Amino acid sequence: MTAPWRRLRSLVWEYWAGFLVCAFWIPDSRGMPHVIRIGGIFEYADGPNAQVMNAEEHAFRFSANIINRNRTLLPNTTLTYDIQRIHFHDSFEATKKACDQLALGVVAIFGPSQGSCTNAVQSICNALEVPHIQLRWKHHPLDNKDTFYVNLYPDYASLSHAILDLVQSLKWRSATVVYDDSTGLIRLQELIMAPSRYNIRLKIRQLPIDSDDSRPLLKEMKRGREFRIIFDCSHTMAAQILKQAMAMGMMTEYYHFIFTTLDLYALDLEPYRYSGVNLTGFRILNVDNPHVSAIVEKWAMERLQAAPRAESGLLDGVMMTDAALLYDAVHIVSVCYQRAPQMTVNSLQCHRHKAWRFGGRFMNFIKEAQWEGLTGRIVFNKTSGLRTDFDLDIISLKEDGLEKVGVWSPADGLNITEVAKGRGPNVTDSLTNRSLIVTTVLEEPFVMFRKSDRTLYGNDRFEGYCIDLLKELAHILGFSYEIRLVEDGKYGAQDDKGQWNGMVKELIDHKADLAVAPLTITHVREKAIDFSKPFMTLGVSILYRKPNGTNPSVFSFLNPLSPDIWMYVLLAYLGVSCVLFVIARFSPYEWYDAHPCNPGSEVVENNFTLLNSFWFGMGSLMQQGSELMPKALSTRIIGGIWWFFTLIIISSYTANLAAFLTVERMESPIDSADDLAKQTKIEYGAVKDGATMTFFKKSKISTFEKMWAFMSSKPSALVKNNEEGIQRTLTADYALLMESTTIEYITQRNCNLTQIGGLIDSKGYGIGTPMGSPYRDKITIAILQLQEEDKLHIMKEKWWRGSGCPEEENKEASALGIQKIGGIFIVLAAGLVLSVLVAVGEFIYKLRKTAEREQRSFCSTVADEIRFSLTCQRRLKHKPQPPMMVKTDAVINMHTFNDRRLPGKDSMSCSTSLAPVFP
């Protein structure tokens, strides 16, 4: 409900009450007594608490005077009061004073506030049926039969619900409850029962008994890192706790205190405004109502005159909750008495046990009353007389003082109304002009020592990506900082006992405010500290030295096809040639007349002899002609299929040849994490107590579990830091598992190292803060702003870009060297040598036959043939003559020449002359 609506409703109630009084009760005012008496019993004690008791008495007088001056409430009637003072815990004296006031004819008794005294007075009022007005919290058992009372203090069950709703709104998962006395356990029973219904862990502690020194307890909570604490105590004790917490160094932004007292607004909180502590409380005084503010100001003026010196720890002239409740109680009694003008008041005697005749009627009027007072809406439960319907303001300490941040009511629950004060695009309220301690670790290129000829001090000693990021954040948020290296040089990991080390421990112990480093955001770390949004995303990968390029073989031209394919091609060649030979012998269309000029010749010839069939297949495979063309359909089908086969094979070979001969293949023994896990020759590991090690340690994937088992079984597999791991990778057969961003930086500067495979996982680097730190959200907003402005990318380019490695020769196609295709020259040379040897064999074989035919010596025949061959100008020679000449007009029988003909000659000349054997 908004403040203007509450103010309007307050004015409506006030005017409505006045209207009722004027319209209905004034005509009957003649029957009213001219004087109405009420009684007030207040505890009094010597010492520093006397001023508080006097404040209640002052409020009693103050409210009566206000009513008497406002003639619309009790026209023609004067409200008088009787005040009695008693000592603390003196119930006998309280009983006696109550009887004295009843004898005076009071219509109601207000107070006392202390438990045993309250019970004594309540018993008397219940017996004589006189309303008893209570103003302090009091436990009422379920079997309580007292009905002549109302309590203006909010019901404890509702207050406990309000505290629980606030804790849930703050998303607390753990808290410490500190109570003053045993009644606190009753008041906070809803909160104490929360762990059984909600995911909240509570630790219960009690303040020291009979002592105001809470420092031992505060020290114990500080040592136990209990940062979220709920104090159930009086405002006096709250003031002492705040002072002692300040002395203990606990008034920082990491602590959040909730005080259940409704008088937190009355404390002097000036010393804590700029401490950054999170201080939250409740307020029932409706200061948003202008009418209430006017009454409070009038009270302050009179209070300062009556008591110039305020109680220690309180603001001067402030109206406490008890005083406001007493003010409202007096007004309610006056208004209710106005509604019953025919009542008469008698003097009552305690020893006679004779009740007031109109007491029950008057008590019902009070329980049915509705009033908008200083403490907001006042409505009583008609059965119990408790105040169960009310509004509570949620107040929080800011740099400008206490501010209202929300409203709670039993019907509507908690409604947070705080609006962040934005100054442009950045929210910098709690970081401006603050000095923060920043912990970090040396890690290139994130944090490095700056190289300089002169000695550097402070933050000037460092440079790197994280240092630039820290400068940008400080510029946006307006804070200053001091950089400190973590003592153990570790990022932060949890041991088997649950203890942390490294930067995480520094944040947990509040030795640092921020951890600005390549700190990986993990689930385990999130349970101990808070993280901002990631400023860089990455993943785990493998760093390994570059493999050496393989020396190419002179027979590299065979690599495009596997040995199996080469064998299959050879078998296909042999098979097709043989099938072609057989089919050609069977097909009648492959036989033709060898002598078309001789019609009577009975000799036919077939071109596809076995050798010619092999020659046809070889010519097709080599994409060359053989001058042998199939004539039959069957042989043409074989030829066509073979040509298609050779087309695909040669095209595939040609396409793959370029890749194999122009790109030098880099053979690495590992290509992925699976390859690492399957072997034991190459040792691998990670930085000890780092996020990468934790990833493998906590992983449930079988491959990573196997890798962690290998690393944990060999202590030498884990290195102390990245530098040690890099050096080991260069000098030994070792692979380092690390973040991809670091690998990218290293490989830009060391050309002997490379990244193997892709990313094993995906994660991010974030800025760490202590759990519950108010700086986290503001740093996150600043990081998002830097990301939108592309400054994060610019900073990464600045620190990651190195001189770079020279372009590798295998990145582009280059001229082929003899080492890659020298084998083809060897094959050519071998073919030439083979052809020479075959030619020599043919030469010797033919000349031996010629010498026998001509009956000449073999040597002379060889000499003549060599002499003729060396005569390069002559193109013709005489055919060797057999012993017996053949007639010139005889038809040459093809069987004489073993049925042979010259290839490609479909017809022969019919000349009677002899054709030369060697054209």
UniProtKB/Swiss-Prot annotation:
Mutagenesis or variant effect for residue 620 to A: Loss of spermine-binding
The UniProt activity regulation field reads: Glutamate-gated receptor activity inhibited by spermine.
Question: Which UniProt keywords are given for this protein, alphabetically ordered?
Answer: Cell membrane, Disulfide bond, Glycoprotein, Ion channel, Ion transport, Isopeptide bond, Ligand-gated ion channel, Membrane, Phosphoprotein, Postsynaptic cell membrane, Receptor, Signal, Synapse, Transmembrane, Transmembrane helix, Transport, Ubl conjugation
In the bilayer, the protein is annotated as:
Multi-pass membrane protein
Q: From what organism does this protein derive?
A: Mus musculus
Signal among keywords: yes
Q: Which InterPro entries match?
A: ANF_lig-bd_rcpt (IPR001828), Glu/Gly-bd (IPR019594), Iono_Glu_rcpt_met (IPR001508), Ionotropic_Glu_rcpt (IPR015683), Iontro_rcpt_C (IPR001320), Peripla_BP_I (IPR028082)
Note the subunit structure: Homotetramer, and heterotetramer with either GRIK4 or GRIK5. Can form functional heteromeric receptors with GRIK2. Interacts with PRKCABP. Interacts with NETO2.
Name of the protein this chain belongs to: Glutamate receptor ionotropic, kainate 3
Per UniProt, location of the Glycyl lysine isopeptide (Lys-Gly) (interchain with G-Cter in SUMO1) cross-link in this chain: 887
Localization, UniProt: Cell membrane; Postsynaptic cell membrane
| Protein origin, superkingdom | Eukaryota
Q: In which tissues is it expressed?
A: Detected in whole brain, cerebellum, brain cortex and hippocampus.
Q: Which GO terms describe its biological process?
A: regulation of membrane potential
Specify the signal sequence span: 1-31
**More about this protein:** The postsynaptic actions of Glu are mediated by a variety of receptors that are named according to their selective agonists. This receptor binds domoate > kainate >> L-glutamate = quisqualate >> AMPA = NMDA.
Record's function text = Ionotropic glutamate receptor that functions as a cation-permeable ligand-gated ion channel, gated by L-glutamate and the glutamatergic agonist kainic acid. Binding of the excitatory neurotransmitter L-glutamate induces a conformation change, leading to the opening of the cation channel, and thereby converts the chemical signal to an electrical impulse. The receptor then desensitizes rapidly and enters a transient inactive state, characterized by the presence of bound agonist.
Q: Report the SS bond pairs.
A: 99-350
